[in-house]
């Protein structure tokens, strides 16, 4: 199970899992608390012994695997919005990985959240706002902002904005891991079948 392709596909599913929740919040104004918690929890696992340590909620990750099948499979379920968010996240991740200053600030701010979690649940509004602040201060300054589509009435609400930014930070965490595990954008074109087959196997494990 610790084969590189399984680990890479797990991290890629983690990106899409978070992006799927971004869409849900942007369109409906709220996220499933368990899914939100699962996504945000990945940010806090900074020194994992294995990739599976990062994604401890298998049910939540299965939604990510399903999106892998939808986006890279041969059926007609591809979502151009998901693709656009994915491209934006991967572009920002490249800039992040090249900036030791940004990476250092990110680690420092995540440590602050660790302390906050002694007093609050990870889905508490104050914690979510903190994650959102990390994304705004460190990630979104690295390059073009990701334009989020959704219901304008919800997108105006500060808590909705916080959840979306917090989930984008979770997507970024998985993108960093995916790259560390050898993931490259060209794999999404030339190794599509392998990734899809691996996602299918992972869904049944």
Curated annotation (Swiss-Prot):
Coiled coil: which residue ranges?
A: none
Signal peptide region: none
Keywords of the record, alphabetical order, are: Cell inner membrane, Cell membrane, Cytoplasm, Membrane
The record gives the membrane topology as: Peripheral membrane protein
Major location (coarse) = cytoplasm
Q: Which GO terms describe its cellular component?
A: cytoplasm; plasma membrane
State where the protein is found. Cytoplasm; Cell inner membrane
Q: Has the keyword Cell inner membrane been applied to this entry?
A: yes
Enumerate the InterPro entries for this protein. HflD, HflD-like_sf
Family of the protein in this entry: Belongs to the HflD family.
Q: Which NCBIfam families match?
A: PRK00218.1-2, PRK00218.1-4
Q: What is this protein called?
A: High frequency lysogenization protein HflD homolog
Q: Which organism is it from?
A: Shewanella loihica (strain ATCC BAA-1088 / PV-4)
